[in-house]
């Protein structure tokens, strides 16, 4: 299973509607696809969705850095995943997003070689239901309430709401959404680092009557030492997202009792290898974990869904963004069923790829 060729593709996909969070507005998912070929004829797929405000990467930078990573991996064994992860770290510091795409492709190949679906290769089992939420982008309260009603009509039972503005506006957003969607809907909120410490405490306290499941990343990730104060002052559980990128972050947050749960994303952790380390730390600390992502296609979320089956500590799922795409370029992969329930493929490996017609229209570079 020697790596002989790597293909990189720029993959911009238009969204049905602009995706708005406190950090900015996106009209496209600007992703990068990685295809790794081996001497045995196997092909492994990976994908990443860079956010400049979170990863410090873009589609263009990931495409360039990916070429350096590809050159380093040519001639190595795709089965030496840990060694190849260390090799990528030696080639360039950071750049976790593009590294995650390579790491996913390596795991795809390794699971194919083992003849197992990826979740089974990772030691996971299909012993639980994966039910995704659906996100309401940040907007005017009446628009967000209308969106929540439509999401409920579409059969989703869990709604994630983007907040992170003024205290008054965020409370009005949640009040109107709860009234419009009703008490049967599970509500989660995500501030995307949008509040100050004081605003976070005040806003979360005012939101307590609305039965919020948890709040993701209330303040800047640089203010992670303030999370214990927020957690102690409020009854709504705190989930670390941007402040938890790797196992070192997770261990630090556990030590200072900064949060109630982690939001795990493969492109933050540079892929599956370090994601598994975070999961083990969460298990030891008896902390629940959410698995989510950015604006990956169904292929990226197929990888995330396989990972979600490796531990019972993973109990929250945020896999909705492929449903926001105008067109679906993926063949195989996860299947969205009623109520937001997700079926994970049984095919050996990742069980997902891209339509040939789609790839042929993308900007591409091949490294041998």
Swiss-Prot record:
Cofactor: Mg(2+)
Residues engaged in binding Mg(2+): 190, 216, 241
List of residues binding substrate: 135, 160-162, 265, 318-320
Assigned keywords, A-Z: Isomerase, Magnesium, Metal-binding
Pfam families documented for this protein: MR_MLE_C, MR_MLE_N
SUPFAM superfamilies: Enolase C-terminal domain-like, Enolase N-terminal domain-like
Cofactor binding summary note: Binds 1 Mg(2+) ion per subunit.
One GO MF term attached to the UniProt entry: racemase and epimerase activity, acting on amino acids and derivatives
GO biological process, one term: peptide metabolic process
Cysteines joined through disulfide linkages: none
CDD domains: L-Ala-DL-Glu_epimerase (cd03319)
Family annotation (InterPro entries): Dipeptide_epimerase (IPR034603), Enolase-like_C_sf (IPR036849), Enolase-like_N (IPR029017), Enolase_C-like (IPR029065), Mandelate_racemase_C (IPR013342), Mandelate_racemase_N_dom (IPR013341)
Assigned EC number: 5.1.1.-
UniProt miscellaneous comment: Part of a large, functionally divergent protein family. Protein modeling and substrate docking were used to predict the substrate specificity, prior to biochemical analysis.
Similarity annotation: Belongs to the mandelate racemase/muconate lactonizing enzyme family.
Function: Catalyzes the epimerization of D-Ala-D-Ala to D-Ala-L-Ala. Has broad substrate specificity and catalyzes the epimerization of a variety of dipeptides containing an N-terminal Ala followed by a hydrophobic or polar residue, such as Val, Ser and Met (in vitro).
Name of the molecule in the record: D-Ala-D/L-Ala epimerase
Organism: Cytophaga hutchinsonii (strain ATCC 33406 / DSM 1761 / CIP 103989 / NBRC 15051 / NCIMB 9469 / D465)
């Amino acid at each position: 299973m020697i790596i002989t060729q790597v293909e990189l593709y720029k993959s911009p996909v238009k969204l049905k509607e602009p995706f708005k969070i406190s950090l900015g507005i996106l009209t496209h998912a600007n992703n990068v696809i990685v295809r790794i070929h081996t001497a045995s004829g196997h092909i492994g797929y990976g994908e990443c969705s860079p956010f400049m405000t979170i990863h410090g990467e873009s589609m263009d930078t990931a495409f360039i850095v990916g070429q350096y990573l590809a050159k380093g991996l040519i001639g190595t064994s795709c089965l030496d995943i840990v060694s190849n992860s260390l090799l990528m770290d030696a080639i360039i510091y950071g750049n976790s997003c593009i590294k995650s795409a390579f790491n996913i492709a390596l795991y795809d190949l390794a699971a194919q070689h083992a003849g197992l679906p990826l979740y089974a290769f990772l030691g996971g089992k299909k012993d639980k239901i994966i039910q995704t939420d659906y996100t309401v982008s940040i907007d005017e309260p009446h628009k967000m309430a209308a969106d929540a009603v439509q999401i409920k009509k579409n059969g989703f039972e869990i709604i994630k709401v983007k907040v992170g503005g003024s205290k008054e506006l965020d409370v009005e957003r949640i009040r109107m959404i709860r009234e419009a969607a009703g008490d049967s809907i599970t509500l989660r909120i995500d501030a995307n680092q949008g509040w100050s410490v004081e605003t976070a405490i005040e806003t979360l306290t005012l939101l307590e009557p609305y039965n919020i499941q948890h709040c993701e990343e209330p303040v800047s990730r640089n203010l992670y030492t303030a999370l214990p104060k927020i957690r102690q002052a409020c009854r709504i559980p705190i989930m670390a997202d941007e402040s938890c990128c790797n196992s070192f972050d997770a261990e630090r947050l556990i030590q200072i009792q900064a949060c109630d749960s982690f939001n795990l994303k493969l492109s933050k952790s540079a892929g599956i290898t370090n994601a598994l380390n975070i999961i083990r730390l969460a298990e030891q600390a008896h902390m629940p974990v959410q698995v989510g992502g950015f604006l990956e296609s169904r292929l990226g979320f197929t990888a995330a869904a396989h990972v979600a089956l490796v531990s019972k500590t993973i109990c929250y799922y945020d896999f909705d963004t492929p449903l926001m795409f105008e067109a679906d370029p993926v063949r195989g992969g996860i299947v969205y069923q009623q109520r937001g329930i997700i079926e994970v493929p049984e095919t050996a490996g990742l069980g997902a790829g891209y339509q040939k017609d789609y790839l042929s229209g993308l900007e591409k570079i091949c490294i041998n």
